[in-house]
């Protein structure tokens, strides 16, 4: 009986203790008062200040950033990589694995090195081509004509007009030497073409011979 009484008393004391730790909500002036734990620790858990926030650096007050590990290559590794780059700028997986075994580097590091090396070569090529292009435009600009409105044209001259002989040159009899020596002096029409040349493309034709031959005989008087 005594044992039953003791167990009953222990249950009552436990119930009173639970009732004290968990008070029932009370209604005061028509409002419901909640029993949510508003301690600083619980508020931090609910507000999410401790979830997913980067820790601040105590020295500078900045969040810790993920640092990238920079690989340093020794001269022997650089020599092997440069020789492989000279043979093939785009090595496949098998070539990269072979280089990894020879140099002691990982295949991923070798792939990144080849990507950086190709980018460096393209940058060097662009830097070399820029002054050459500027020099070529400045050099050849002096040889070009200032204006192309009047291009150079070389036209062919028209063919010369044929000079036909006079129709009476073959029908007239030959003159004696004495008649030729005493011929009249040339008329202004004969020596005019010599002073004023004919226009381009037309050759001057010789003047026609006199229609009637000259005679040395004097006319007789009709006495």
From Swiss-Prot:
<dbReference type="GO" id="GO:0009887">
    <property type="term" value="P:animal organ morphogenesis"/>
</dbReference>
<dbReference type="GO" id="GO:0006915">
    <property type="term" value="P:apoptotic process"/>
</dbReference>
<feature type="compositionally biased region" description="Basic and acidic residues">
    <location>
        <begin position="1"/>
        <end position="13"/>
    </location>
</feature>
<dbReference type="GO" id="GO:0021979">
    <property type="term" value="P:hypothalamus cell differentiation"/>
</dbReference>
<keyword id="KW-0539">Nucleus</keyword>
<dbReference type="GO" id="GO:0021983">
    <property type="term" value="P:pituitary gland development"/>
</dbReference>
<feature type="region of interest" description="Disordered">
    <location>
        <begin position="168"/>
        <end position="223"/>
    </location>
</feature>
<dbReference type="GO" id="GO:0048850">
    <property type="term" value="P:hypophysis morphogenesis"/>
</dbReference>
<dbReference type="GO" id="GO:0003682">
    <property type="term" value="F:chromatin binding"/>
</dbReference>
<dbReference type="GO" id="GO:0016477">
    <property type="term" value="P:cell migration"/>
</dbReference>
<dbReference type="GO" id="GO:0000122">
    <property type="term" value="P:negative regulation of transcription by RNA polymerase II"/>
</dbReference>
<keyword id="KW-0371">Homeobox</keyword>
<dbReference type="GO" id="GO:0001227">
    <property type="term" value="F:DNA-binding transcription repressor activity, RNA polymerase II-specific"/>
</dbReference>
<dbReference type="GO" id="GO:0001568">
    <property type="term" value="P:blood vessel development"/>
</dbReference>
<dbReference type="GO" id="GO:0005634">
    <property type="term" value="C:nucleus"/>
</dbReference>
<comment type="similarity">
    <text>Belongs to the paired homeobox family.</text>
</comment>
<dbReference type="GO" id="GO:0000978">
    <property type="term" value="F:RNA polymerase II cis-regulatory region sequence-specific DNA binding"/>
</dbReference>
<dbReference type="GO" id="GO:0045944">
    <property type="term" value="P:positive regulation of transcription by RNA polymerase II"/>
</dbReference>
<dbReference type="GO" id="GO:0001228">
    <property type="term" value="F:DNA-binding transcription activator activity, RNA polymerase II-specific"/>
</dbReference>
<dbReference type="InterPro" id="IPR001356">
    <property type="entry name" value="HD"/>
</dbReference>
<dbReference type="InterPro" id="IPR042412">
    <property type="entry name" value="PROP1"/>
</dbReference>
<protein>
    <recommendedName>
        <fullName>Homeobox protein prophet of Pit-1</fullName>
    </recommendedName>
</protein>
<dbReference type="GO" id="GO:0008013">
    <property type="term" value="F:beta-catenin binding"/>
</dbReference>
<feature type="region of interest" description="Disordered">
    <location>
        <begin position="1"/>
        <end position="69"/>
    </location>
</feature>
<dbReference type="GO" id="GO:0021984">
    <property type="term" value="P:adenohypophysis development"/>
</dbReference>
<comment type="function">
    <text>Possibly involved in the ontogenesis of pituitary gonadotropes, as well as somatotropes, lactotropes and caudomedial thyrotropes.</text>
</comment>
<dbReference type="GO" id="GO:0060126">
    <property type="term" value="P:somatotropin secreting cell differentiation"/>
</dbReference>
<dbReference type="InterPro" id="IPR009057">
    <property type="entry name" value="Homeodomain-like_sf"/>
</dbReference>
<keyword id="KW-0238">DNA-binding</keyword>
<dbReference type="GO" id="GO:0005667">
    <property type="term" value="C:transcription regulator complex"/>
</dbReference>
<dbReference type="Pfam" id="PF00046">
    <property type="entry name" value="Homeodomain"/>
</dbReference>
<feature type="compositionally biased region" description="Polar residues">
    <location>
        <begin position="171"/>
        <end position="180"/>
    </location>
</feature>
<feature type="DNA-binding region" description="Homeobox">
    <location>
        <begin position="66"/>
        <end position="125"/>
    </location>
</feature>
<dbReference type="GO" id="GO:0048732">
    <property type="term" value="P:gland development"/>
</dbReference>
<dbReference type="GO" id="GO:0043066">
    <property type="term" value="P:negative regulation of apoptotic process"/>
</dbReference>
<dbReference type="InterPro" id="IPR017970">
    <property type="entry name" value="Homeobox_CS"/>
</dbReference>
<dbReference type="GO" id="GO:0009953">
    <property type="term" value="P:dorsal/ventral pattern formation"/>
</dbReference>
């Amino acid at each position: 009986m005594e044992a039953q009484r003791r167990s009953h008393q222990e249950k009552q004391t436990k119930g009173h203790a639970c009732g004290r730790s968990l008070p029932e909500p009370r209604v005061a002036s028509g409002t419901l008062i909640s029993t949510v734990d508003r301690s600083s620790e619980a508020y931090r858990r609910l507000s999410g200040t401790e979830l997913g926030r980067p820790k601040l650096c105590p020295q500078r007050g900045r969040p810790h950033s993920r640092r990238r590990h920079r690989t340093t290559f020794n001269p022997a590794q650089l020599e092997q990589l440069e020789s492989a780059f000279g043979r093939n700028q785009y090595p496949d997986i098998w070539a990269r694995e072979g280089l990894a075994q020879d140099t002691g580097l990982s295949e991923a590091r070798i792939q990144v090195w080849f990507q950086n090396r190709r980018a460096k070569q393209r940058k060097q090529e662009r830097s070399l081509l820029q002054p050459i292009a500027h020099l070529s435009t400045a050099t050849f600009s002096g040889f070009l004509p200032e204006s192309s409105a009047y291009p150079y044209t070389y036209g062919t001259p028209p063919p010369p007009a044929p000079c036909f002989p006079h129709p009476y040159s073959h029908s007239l009899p030959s003159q004696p030497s004495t008649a030729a020596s005493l011929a009249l002096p040339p008329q202004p029409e004969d020596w005019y073409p010599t002073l004023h040349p004919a226009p381009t493309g037309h050759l001057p034709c010789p003047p026609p011979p006199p229609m009637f031959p000259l005679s040395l005989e004097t006319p007789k008087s009709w006495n």
